[in-house]
Amino acid sequence: MLIDHLNRQQLEREAQGLQRQRRIAESPCAPRQWVSQDGQPAREMLAFCSNDYLGLANHPALVEALAEGARQFGAGSGASHLISGHSRAHAALEGDLAAWLAPSIPNAAALYFCTGYLANLALLTALGDASATIFADKLNHASLIDGALLAKATMQRYAHRNLTVLASQLESCTTPIKLIVTDAVFSMDGDLADLPALLALAERFDAWLIVDDAHGFGVLGDQGRGSLSHFGLRSERLIYMGTLGKAAGLGGAFVAAHPSIIDWLVQAARPYIYTTAAPPAVAHALRESLRLISSAEGEQRRAHLQQLIIQLRTQLSALIGAHPTLGWRLADSSTAIQPLIVGDNAAALALMAALDAQGLWVPAIRPPTVPVGTARLRITLSATHSAADVQRLVDGLACAARELP
């Protein structure tokens, strides 16, 4: 019965163009990767799909730091943080991360998690008890949505970036604890939340602002310190989640907040308490990643990435203008996430296939990840791309625009 039920659902997904497939990366994360799929021989692709925004995932210094960490601390942690898995490497990283966020969160403390998904589940389930209401942007990441659904708090969602509706919801809220929850950079659209206005609402209505900065950490702000730095924000009402497997090039995530909040997560956050700690070698290497991000090299990489973003948007805007009947639309994004909105699922898959045939790896994103009718190619740029790489992508899209029906 179960297998028949699942098979029927799979057939329905295939008919709607929603079936997901995995590819196998046969080489390190980089703009040029050897990739195989469905048992076919691997081929080299020019990839515009990773979240390795600064190109650190295969940086020699991080590769060496990871190896050094393994030699010093071994391969695994062996237990959860509250048993015997909390190593000196984890503690040192948390100290570095707290200092990293101190300009934005007074007296900040930090807690390291295995993944950003776990960090968000931990935050919302531990803080969102029955005395709380969670106010969530409708385009928040799935982990924030799932965390809010698992929490005992009431959840109210507001239309994307609609602060008028949010203000009305806050004004009518009667629970003593109010948690405003938002992505900083929205993962499928690339646009920025209005964090200054959200913080102003938090202060006006005695609420707390939880910011998921998965796609801003390392890329935005002074020395790559993230979206809070980008907007020049500073407040004890800020609760910050940053991921360490995107711009930081490794893995894991962290929460930075008032020490009382971090202490409560240690006591009450089940995804933290009941998870084996990440390998200490990763924590050790992440300290080197923070050094790189804040260094002159990190600044050069961010500047180059910004030039690529401008180049891509300028050239794609011209291409879209030359082919108005295709109905393509470039999302309003100033970040390394540059979605090309195509419309229906079949069109997005056809465009992805046309680029694939040219050796370009750009994923098609479809519902339920994005709203129905907004299927898109999610183009992401890295500091290790070149201007010639971006030109090749634009040329590939131009070729597809001429050939697709």
UniProtKB/Swiss-Prot annotation:
Residues at which substrate binds: 20, 141, 369
Disulphide-bonded residues: none
Pathway(s) the chain acts in: Cofactor biosynthesis; biotin biosynthesis
One example of a Gene Ontology biological process annotation: biotin biosynthetic process
Cofactor (UniProt): pyridoxal 5'-phosphate
Tagged with keyword Transferase: yes
Catalytic activity: 6-carboxyhexanoyl-[ACP] + L-alanine + H(+) = (8S)-8-amino-7-oxononanoate + holo-[ACP] + CO2
N6-(pyridoxal phosphate)lysine PTM sites in chain numbering: 246
SUPFAM superfamilies, alphabetized: PLP-dependent transferases
Residues binding pyridoxal 5'-phosphate, per UniProt: 116-117, 187, 215, 243
Keywords: Biotin biosynthesis, Pyridoxal phosphate, Transferase
One Gene Ontology term of the molecular function aspect: pyridoxal phosphate binding
Stored Pfam families: Aminotran_1_2
Similarity section: Belongs to the class-II pyridoxal-phosphate-dependent aminotransferase family. BioF subfamily.
NCBIfam families: bioF
Function field: Catalyzes the decarboxylative condensation of pimeloyl-[acyl-carrier protein] and L-alanine to produce 8-amino-7-oxononanoate (AON), [acyl-carrier protein], and carbon dioxide.
Quaternary context: Homodimer.
Name of the protein: 8-amino-7-oxononanoate synthase 2
Source organism: Polaromonas sp. (strain JS666 / ATCC BAA-500)
Gene name in the database record: bioF2
